[in-house]
Amino acid sequence: MKVLSAAVLSLVGAAAYAGPITTVPWNGHPGAVSFTFDDSEISQLNNLGDYFEKNQDIKVTFFMTGGMNAGNQSKYFPMAEKGHEIGNHSKTHADLTNSNNLKGEITDYKYDLEQRSGAEVVAFATPYCYYNDAVEAEIAKAHIVNRNCQGATKYKWNEEPVWERISSDCYQGNTQQSKGNMSEAKQKNAWTVQLNHGVDGAGFGYGITPSDMISIMDEAKAQGLWRAPMGRVAAYYRAHFVIDKAEATSIDGGFKVTWKSPHSAMPKSVPLRVNIEGAEGKTVKQKGKEIQPEDDGAFVIEFMDLELEVVGAAPASSSSEALPESSSDVIASSDATVPTSSADVPTSSTTAIAQDLQWASQEPTTFAVFSVTGVLVKSFVATTQSAEGSFKALQIPHGTYYLKDLKSNYIRKVVK
């Protein structure tokens, strides 16, 4: 045995823990779908209004343009108060790739819609689905997502898309294809976007009958999909790629996680369903307000608060007592020992832990897991007999670590 060098121990510094927050995919559903309706064709409200009233679990996006049916827009604005979305479809519905006024067509019209509707406008839809680099750059200035129509792409949870090129399935008479998109989204645990125009069966081949439209939306419900507006799903999706990477830092009596908004045009409120490692039995707070867990143990937090605190231990796989408040508490002793020979180090498991007589205590104790460079990775409470299983259960990368018994101060080299 030898003493772990002071140089290694000094590397711990201020404790930091990676990724204690994990977003629940698609708000707790097996997939998501956004139904979008273009051009303020009044048949959309006339023929689907009752359906939306009776089915409050579906919310859609209405993309509006000043170039088509602008006189109907005021009839759509109250839908935003009911949870539906007002989206930007450009000022004149022109081919934007040939426009010399992209700011007026895209950004200025967004603010015009917001002023008249009182709603946040965060999603854009390119007219005719025509775009180029200049169009995308202008869209990205004030919108978090853009819809085009290159087909029913299925966007998987952990694969970040190009936000200015979210493709959709433009309905052209094939109801069975649209229904198939719903089952495929569930199968792939993915998000898909549907594009519709008139809901009266007319519309130069782009219209759909009310019964067919309702049957597609009902199919989405039958598949268990999250049926939410495009901007809302995009905000949830974008938030996931940020918050799941956010690191926690130790604070007095617990830990704090902070993150940044991925875009200046994010909605003012982005409710996010998350799991928080190390929060069981602790108090979760945002801006001083306590967040109660849901029945399944998840938390619905406000992403746009950009921070979260857990009063209690730092993230751990299990804990029945408070963890050390700082890394200096964890490694206060300089006589901690580690094995000196490879024979003492397990090559594929931690079975050697229980074999060491120095680790024979039956009493629960706190174990700290360090990287080989001395960085504190995780902590957990266990007896020496259960330490092996607890260590294996940790969600950390495979590799070599040092496992320290904080009661005896012994350190053991282990492999996951």
Predicted regions and their residues:
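C-terminal tail/sorting-segment detector
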Residues: 3, 379, 398-416
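N-terminal pre-catalytic segment of deacetylase/amide-hydrolase enzymes
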Residues: 3-35, 43, 47, 210, ...
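C-terminal domain-boundary segment and adjacent tail
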Residues: 19-25, 55, 60, 68-71, ...
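Metal-dependent polysaccharide deacetylase catalytic core of the NodB/CE4 family, i.e.
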Residues: 30-33, 42-43, 54-145, 149-166, ...
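Glycine-centered tight-turn motifs at strand-turn-strand junctions
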Residues: 290, 354-361, 366, 376-396
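C-terminal beta-strand-rich structural cap/linker in extracellular carbohydrate-active enzymes
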Residues: 295-316
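Ser/Thr/Gly/Pro-rich low-complexity, disordered linker/stalk segments of secreted
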Residues: 314-351
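Terminal processing/anchoring signals of secreted or surface-associated proteins
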Residues: 318, 353, 369, 374, ...
